[in-house]
From Swiss-Prot:
Regulation: Inhibited by 50 mM NaF (sodium fluoride).
Binding site for Mn(2+) 2: D920, D963
Keyword DNA repair set for record: no
The encoding gene: spnA
Source organism of this protein record: Dictyostelium discoideum
Stated name of the protein: Protein spalten
Region feature G5 motif, mapped onto this chain: 427-432
Positions of the UniProt region annotated as G1 motif: 117-130
Length: 975
């Protein structure tokens, strides 16, 4: 075995080390052959056109003969003689083809003989899009360039890169020189011009501004740190943009091939393209953007059935927390970096590849090619930063070849026990000649394999993969050279985002108590793991040799089946009754718990009784045996409210005394003292002690509210909030009296200044109360009207700043919510418990939606208007797509940023114990379920709502949040 491996190594070296001249000759010969094939194809096409013309002429002659046959005999004889004399050259062809003309089909010429389908996979920013663009330029069927699109995109990349550097300098608490502050404002205003589809009016002046900002010592420090810190990294090739800024801003600028390849244009969908190499057609499908995660690879085989896989690995991203902390000399930057975890993209890519090797996509593919993307940055990094910081067992020092070999073995070790041909290639994807040299051999080998398997039909929507003309084909390629050693899996798999799990579990709760005030709210939860029922299976599906066993020593699990949510957040302006919407709207519930299953806990007492267990007809009667006779009489009456029964044992005792509310009152005085702190803090000074009471139909709620707010690591505090336990007592209301108590809570997270959020603090709820819809009792429409009116007021008074917002209106037992941007609200709902004596657990119910520019639905809305999402931001600048203010994005007919809110309406029950409103400074670091559990624990410890809010904000700060943090907690005490 060792001899064979040694021979394979030797043969591989001999194959991979030809002289440069011989390579050039081979390439020249290949080009000549390709040109000859193109000439032959053109000649065949011309012959085909001549055949078509001849067939048309023959058909015309037949029609003429038919017309002549109906004329007089004398005239027909003359005409037939004339026709015979004038068409002697075509008479033979007409007579010979007359009988078979209708049965003979004209041959269709193809530009290819064989074909294949390739899926390009890899981790984030590994070079997948770069590879696909390079292959399109080298072998593409059509010209991939769109000059106007890429000119605008590259212009946006250049501006977005500088804006990102400026924002990161603020995050790191380092200030640019005073001379550049005015230039910063001019640069930050340019995305607005881009939104209006205009290039800069004074391009040379803008280029000079960009040059001065780029050469600032602070920006250079941020750029150098971004190369090793994933938290402040700028996607794409920032240095390339900066070096070419004067060319980009030239009015006569036309993008080059390298400009197009270097342009960063994140797509969250599968990117498809077709190439042809020596009459071998390849359909490429690249998974970029959000599709880079392994959880999104589950349905790829069912939908595309790729024959081969290209897995791209970026070698330059191997930095760890310790390396970042020790390599930077700026104490301010080091302090900031200690507050967040640095992603090691190389290890993440290794984990993703291990997950891939245990998936159906890998098992059904014919071969896999590992593409190690070096680029110039890797060779620069390996000289400065030892790979040992990432892999403790590495002993190769700063030698690039040893480092590449070591990393390659880390990946190929997962393939050693797999019955799968594979091969690794080291390529600089930015070097067109290097890409051509490597992929000439790759496509030559793939063409041979496709020819053996008989893949002649290209990919289309009906067959989903090239179809073999041979049928069942059991031939397999031999294993490619493999020198890797099996090592047990040492790296933990990527944990699924808890936030995504929370949203995906909304279908698990069938007892919907939340309704929505608009028929176009985000409600669809669409699975991406569906199969194509009409797809035609390729020959590889019938190959029994594809079954592979997972390595028993691996620590990774199989690729999980997940679902992704695609939602719509547009709202309608028409008024709808909540009673009509109750049947059409769904509740966004996070967690599993189904209230209708609560009576099932009665079954445990049956188990110790063996004679009664095998009797199925007696199952509905057991409730009468373990409980007194009075309880079965109460159950038929209270079947509509099962949530109230699983409460602690004290509740049935209290149910016998419904007319005695004096027992819970001793616990209320301390709660009133806690809320008094809040009433004196934010616009609730008018609220008295009785304002905490909130009555409902058949029940009463005692409210306890509080807030916690931190400036955090930002230079300014741009958050504001409102707590009004008694809304009607705090505002001037001229409408009909409201007999039911109403409370209002809100958080406004400003950006670009404090003007907008400060103005929203007294404005939104006043607009809400003074609207006609509020007087009529249509609170859903009142929220829409209030948000629109408040936005108009803000736009008139605030030029540059903006703000997100989340609001909650509690009317009796109904909770109305609205939000724009990434400020959110979560309701804590008690889960049904089979054991009444057991602890109460809560599930988070998400009552808001994140309107980010990176969201699929929001991105579609913006791009349909002609907008651009660069670096997951609106024109590279604004992170949210819905907000108050942000005047520059709302001017003109095309409003790229809007203030239409996402709304929910919830009928609260005794199972709902508290809700949390907060800005993204909390939710970016704390998951929904974590926040609910945190509040639950502190309530048990007897802490007030204010204390809990402050502790929760501090917890987010300790986790490394660099934003302002504002948290509101409202506790619902039911009587």
């Amino acid at each position: 075995m060792k001899k064979m491996l040694f021979m394979n190594k030797k043969e591989k070296k001999e194959e991979q080390s030809p002289a440069h001249s011989s390579l050039a000759q081979q390439h020249q010969l290949a080009q000549q052959q390709y040109q000859l094939q193109q000439q032959q194809l053109q000649l065949q096409y011309q012959q085909h056109q001549q055949q078509l013309q001849l067939a048309q002429q023959q058909k015309q002659n037949e029609q003429n003969l038919a017309q002549l046959s109906t004329s007089t005999s004398s005239n027909s004889s003359v005409n037939n003689t004339t026709n015979t004399n004038t068409n002697t050259t075509n008479s033979s062809s007409i007579s010979s083809n007359n009988n078979n003309n209708n049965n003979t089909a004209v041959p269709i010429l193809k530009a290819h003989d064989f074909c294949g389908t390739i899926m390009i996979l890899g981790h984030t920013e590994s070079g997948k899009t770069t590879l696909q663009r390079q292959l399109e330029f080298i072998y593409g069927v059509t010209d991939p360039t769109d000059a106007k699109h890429y000119q605008r995109l590259i212009y946006g990349n250049t501006l977005a890169t500088l804006i990102r550097f400026i924002e990161n300098s603020e995050r790191l608490n380092i200030t640019l020189s005073p001379d550049n502050l005015a230039r910063v404002k001019r640069i930050q205003s340019q995305p607005v011009e881009l939104a209006r589809n205009r290039l800069p009016r004074f391009p040379l002046k803008l280029g000079w501004d960009c040059k001065c900002i780029w050469e600032d010592k602070v920006i250079q420090s941020v750029y150098n740190h971004s190369k090793i810190c994933s938290e402040i990294r700028t996607p794409g090739r920032p240095k390339y943009y900066m070096d070419r800024m004067f060319k980009v801003f030239d009015p006569s600028y036309t993008p080059t091939e390298m400009d197009i390849i270097s342009a960063y244009d994140q797509k969250d969908t599968i990117q498809s393209s077709a190439i042809i190499h020596k009459r071998f057609k390849v359909d490429l499908f690249g998974c970029s953007g959000k599709q880079s995660s392994p959880k999104n690879w589950v349905g790829l085989h069912q939908n595309y059935k790729p024959n081969y896989i290209f897995y791209v690995v970026a070698l330059k991203d191997y930095f760890s927390d310790h390396l970042v902390a020790t390599q930077n000399t700026d104490p301010t930057i080091v302090e900031m970096c200690n507050n967040h975890i640095h992603r090691n993209l190389l290890l993440e890519s290794l984990n993703s590849f291990e997950t891939l090797t245990k998936s159906e996509l890998f098992d059904k593919s014919l071969a896999i090619y590992l593409i190690f993307n070096t680029s110039d940055i890797f060779y620069e990094n390996i000289k400065q930063y030892d790979l040992k910081s990432c892999f403790s067992e590495y002993e190769g020092g700063n030698d690039p070849e040893k480092a590449v070999s070591f990393i390659s073995n880390k990946f190929t070790k997962f393939l050693q026990n797999k019955d799968k041909p594979y091969k690794s290639h080291i390529v600089n994807l930015l070097d067109k000649n290097n890409v051509r040299e490597e992929f000439e051999g790759i496509f030559d080998s793939l063409k041979i394999d496709a020819e053996k398997r008989g893949f002649t039909t290209p990919y289309n929507q009906s067959n989903s993969s090239p179809v073999s003309s041979i049928g069942s084909n059991s031939s397999r390629n031999s294993r490619l050279p493999n020198t890797s050693v099996s090592i047990p899996g040492l790296y933990s798999s990527d944990n699924d985002n808890t936030r995504l799990k929370n949203v995906n579990n909304n279908n698990n709760n069938n007892n919907n108590t939340t309704t929505y005030g608009s028929s176009t709210f985000p409600s669809s939860v669409i699975s991406t793991t569906g199969s194509i029922s009409n797809s035609i299976a390729s020959a590889m599906d019938n190959d029994s040799s594809y079954s592979n066993e997972s390595s028993p020593t691996s620590s990774m699990t199989l690729l999980p089946t997940t679902t992704t949510t695609t939602t719509t957040t547009t709202t309608t302006a028409t008024t709808t009754d909540s009673t009509n919407n109750n049947n059409n709207n769904a509740t966004v519930v996070i967690g599993k718990g189904k209230p209708p299953k609560e009576p099932k806990p009665v079954k445990p007492p049956k188990e110790p009784k063996p004679p009664k267990e095998p009797k199925p007809p007696k199952e509905p009667k057991p409730p009468k045996e373990p409980k007194p006779i009075k309880e079965p009489k109460e159950k038929p009456v209270k079947e509509s409210k099962p949530p109230k029964e699983p409460k602690p044992i004290k509740e049935p005792k209290e149910s016998k005394e419904p007319k005695e509310p004096k027992e819970p009152k001793p616990t209320k005085p301390p709660k009133e003292k806690k809320t008094s702190k809040v009433d004196g803090a934010a616009e609730s000074k008018k609220n008295g002690a009785d304002s905490c009471g909130n009555g409902g139909v058949g029940s009463k709620i005692k409210l306890e509210s509080g807030f916690g707010s931190l400036q955090g690591r930002r230079k300014n505090m741009e958050d504001t909030h409102v707590i009004l336990n008694n809304l009607m007592g705090a505002v001037t209301y001229n409408g009909p009296p409201k007999d039911i108590p109403i409370s209002y809570y809100a958080v406004y997270d400003g950006h670009g200044g404090t003007e907008t959020s400060t103005l929203l603090e007294p404005t939104v709820h006043n607009c809400l109360v003074n609207s006609q819809s509020f007087r009529d009792g249509d609170y859903e429409q009142a929220f829409r009207d209030a948000y629109a009116e408040a936005d108009d007021i803000v736009i008139e008074k605030c030029e540059k700043s903006g703000s997100t917002g989340v609001s909650a209106l509690l009317v009796g037992n109904k909770l109305y919510t609205a939000n724009v941007g990434d400020s959110e609200i979560v309701l804590a709902r008690a889960q049904p418990n089979a054991n009444p004596k057991g602890p109460v657990t809560y599930e988070p119910v998400l009552l808001s939606y994140k309107h980010l520019a990176s969201d699929d639905q929001e991105k579609k809305r913006v791009t349909d208007l002609g907008g651009m999402i660069i670096f997951n931001r609106l024109f590279g600048s604004l992170a949210v797509s819905r907000s108050f203010g942000d005047k520059e994005y709302k001017e003109g007919e095309k409003k790229f940023c809007v203030s239409d809110p996402y709304q929910t309406t919830t009928d609260l029950t005794a199972r709902d114990h508290f809700f949390i409103l907060a800005c993204d400074g909390l939710w970016d670091k704390v998951e929904y379920d974590e926040a609910v559990q945190f509040v639950q624990r502190n309530i048990k410890l007897g802490k007030s709502a204010t204390e809990i809010s402050e502790l929760l904000a501090q917890d987010s700060y300790d986790r490394g949040s660099g934003d302002n943090i504002t948290v509101l907690v409202v506790i619902l005490n039911w009587n």
